[in-house]
Regions:
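Conserved PLP-enzyme active-site core in the AAT-like
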Residues: 5-26, 31-217
Length: 217
């Protein structure tokens, strides 16, 4: 970890990050966790519109995230970094965001079974795990298993800004559990300088390789 700290300052020093996060691709030019999220949301919207560049770009459809009152990140909210990329539901005339249901006896623990029902109903294009107030692990593996079994096309992202220094056996290994994208800041539980990072679990042969190329651009 000391060696990683000494090399993380340079934008080209992505190898230690790939080893630490356990993913094949990392972007380190972003300067904060919020910028990491903005770059990811922008890339997702651009990738969604990749086959039609003649018309007004469509924004992201439904997004599933943690409610800010339950510890969710501000940058993952419609009033945060997500605001320029999220669609408006034409029926409700509200932003197309739904929140993870929580357990009645633990308001900071996601109710997995109820979440499955929400996903089945709204078919979110993006699922954002992660909180600024973390008391429990996020059920990444359980939700990945469900969307795979139900063949629901979505992208699973984990904003680890506040827990990036806890990646590993004692907390969570997001990519092993099924996350596709991990964002974070390097100056909270991870003891680095003021920077951001984006890691993805995409390879050249994957359908979403183009999404990674868009994130890089």
């Amino acid at each position: 970890m000391i060696r990683m700290y000494s090399t993380i300052r340079a934008p080209s020093s992505s190898t230690p990050w790939r080893q630490y996060l356990g993913c094949p691709q990392v972007e380190t030019r972003v300067i904060s966790g919020q910028m990491s999220n903005m770059a990811t949301f922008s890339a997702l919207m651009d990738w969604k519109n990749r086959l039609d560049r003649k018309h007004t770009p469509q924004r992201l459809g439904y997004v599933l995230n943690n409610h800010i009152i339950r510890g969710g990140h501000l940058s993952a909210q419609p009033m945060g970094a997500l605001k320029d990329y999220i669609a408006v539901d034409p029926v409700t005339e509200r932003t197309a965001v739904v929140n993870f249901p929580v357990c009645r006896d633990d308001l900071f623990r996601i109710d997995v079974e109820e979440t499955k029902k929400v996903i089945d109903r709204y078919r979110p294009e993006l699922i954002i795990f992660g909180k600024s107030m973390v008391l429990r692990r996020e059920p990444v593996a359980e939700i990945r298993r469900f969307v795979t079994e139900q063949n629901i096309p979505t992208t699973i992202m984990y904003d680890m800004a506040h827990v990036l220094g806890l990646v590993g056996d004692h907390f969570q290994k997001p990519f092993e559990e099924g996350a596709e994208i991990v964002t974070g800041s390097t100056h909270k539980t991870f003891f680095g300088p003021q920077r951001g990072v984006i890691g993805v679990n995409y390879r050249r042969e994957d359908l979403k390789w183009g999404l990674w190329e868009t994130i890089q651009s």
